[in-house]
């Protein structure tokens, strides 16, 4: 079993207790802020159903989104950055934030952006953040993944969901190797669930 799959299996087991506890008090509130890569979840009913089991998920997945810097423009629309989106939700952000952003920028400034989003999310009442790694179809994405993994050492409330490792070799993508097919969107939704429950249970000890 590859390391990515092994870690995922451990997370599934570890998240069961948190899911059982949350079921007694209603769906767990979650906000998912992303760019166009995870956006397929927004229009694939099976993917939404997979992600939302036991969760009250707000999907904010926008084409051309960047982390902190001004987003690019697509078909005349410029979405708010991930930071602006997070800040805009205030105390309604939810218990868990999922971030899957970085394909429209380099790793320059990404470290500072992670820290700003972490501070905002925690100040707004989130227990923590699930941060999704990028598919390394370009060398610049490797640099961003290095930054994401290093951030987990600074922030015990940040849990890295290594989508790059887990999705390696899978036929879930379009021609660019990034954007998801319907099967890929459902796979990403299923992949994220145990990470969400793990974060909801509280930060891991050092």
Question: What spans do the regions from the language model cover?
Answer:
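Conserved beta-strand segments of alpha/beta enzyme cores
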Residues: 56-58, 128, 157-159
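Conserved SGNH/GDSL esterase-like catalytic core that processes O-acyl groups on lipids
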Residues: 27-113, 140-142
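Catalytic His-Asp segment of secreted/periplasmic serine-dependent ester chemistry enzymes
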Residues: 136-206
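Residues at the C-termini of beta-strands that transition into short coil/loop
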Residues: 61-63, 133-135, 164
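Secretory targeting and sorting signals
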Residues: 2-24
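Active-site segments of SGNH/GDSL-like serine hydrolases
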Residues: 98-104, 115-147
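N-terminal low-complexity, Pro/Thr-rich disordered segments
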Residues: 20-26, 203-206
């Amino acid at each position: 079993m590859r390391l990515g799959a092994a870690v995922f299996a451990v997370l599934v087991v570890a998240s069961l207790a948190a899911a059982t506890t949350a079921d007694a008090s209603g769906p767990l509130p979650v906000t998912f802020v992303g760019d166009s890569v995870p956006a397929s979840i927004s229009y694939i009913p099976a993917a939404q159903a997979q992600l939302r089991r036991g969760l009250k998920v707000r999907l904010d997945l926008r084409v051309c989104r960047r982390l902190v810097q001004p987003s690019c423009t697509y078909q005349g629309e410029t979405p708010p950055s991930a930071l602006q989106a997070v800040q805009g939700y205030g105390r309604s952000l939810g218990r868990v934030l999922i971030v899957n952003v970085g394909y429209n920028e380099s790793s320059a400034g990404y470290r500072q952006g992670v820290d700003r989003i972490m501070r905002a999310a925690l100040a707004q009442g989130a227990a923590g953040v699930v941060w999704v790694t990028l598919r390394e179809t370009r060398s610049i994405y490797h640099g961003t993944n290095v930054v994401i993994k290093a951030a987990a050492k600074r922030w015990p409330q940040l849990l890295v969901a290594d989508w790059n490792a887990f999705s390696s070799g899978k036929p879930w993508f379009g021609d660019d190797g990034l954007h998801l097919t319907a099967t890929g969107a459902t796979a990403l939704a299923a992949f994220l669930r145990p990470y969400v429950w793990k974060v909801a249970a509280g930060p891991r000890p050092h």
